[in-house]
Amino acid sequence: MLTKEDVNNAYYSEDSHSFGSKQSLIKHFGKAEKQLIEKALADNDIYTRYHLYRKPKYYSPYYVYRARQLIQADVINFDNKDLVDFNDGYKYLFTAIDVFTKYAWVFPIKKHNCKTSQQCIARIVQESNPLKIENFQSDRGSEFKCRDVINYLSKENINQYYALSDRKAAVVERFNLTIQMLLYKMMDKSMTRRWIDFIEPAMKIYLHRTHRTIKMSPLEAESSHNHQTLREIFMQKYTKANLRKKKPKFKVSDTVR
């Protein structure tokens, strides 16, 4: 018989459902245990402390059809004296994500500049081989809008462009929230300020966890055998998005003021 202790042990393990949502634990234990899981999580200090309510908001999707068609990148700032002193001088996390497969990369860095960004991008290009990155998107931060990065991407024949709307690079921004929440939960559970020790287990959880958008884990999505299934999932999203678009109020040749 399932107990609250079993639920908490599963929540704190390093499996795909660890430090996750209520739904991930229900999927793990079964719908019959939903009530007990809800009660256990309601008494779980880490879960309740970091639980977020998000008001649904509709955005037009990114139109992608293959792996490495679009990579989004960003930098997470951990430049807080209380944290820097405990993390060997590391102040930032360089993050990047494949918008199609949701596969992600994170690299701890000490300096927030053009050279470190170029080095991180080069690692992603190398690890992606033989897949060819086609497009690279980021915000207009100085660490991306600089000579080293621009020249490197040009040399690799990768199209670079910047996010100009208030959404910024929305997919990597959402990934940033996911990885930060995992790191802070693990730090809180272990009562430590060394986030650098939890990068590997946090990424293991993320890469093995079923992603809500693609209905599979990023590791499963990386397999070429699943790319056609991914395309079908995205095409359903695109069809719904097109139906939601407002029809124009005017037609060609209409007289307007």
What are these regions (language model features)?
Residues C114-I124:
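A short, polar/charged loop-to-alpha-helix boundary motif
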Residues K102-F107, Y161-A163:
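Short small-residue beta-strand/loop micro-motif enriched in glycine and branched aliphatics
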Residues T116, F144-R147, A170:
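Residues that form or flank phosphate/diphosphate-binding pockets in enzymes
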Residues M1-T101, P108-K110, R123-Q137, S142, ...:
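RNase H-like DDE catalytic core and adjacent DNA/metal-binding regions
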Residues E33, N113-T116, F198:
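Short amphipathic alpha-helical segments
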Residues K4-Y12, K27, Q35-E38, H51, ...:
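Domain-scale segment recognizer with a strong primary affinity
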Residues P108-K115, S165:
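Short beta->alpha junction loops
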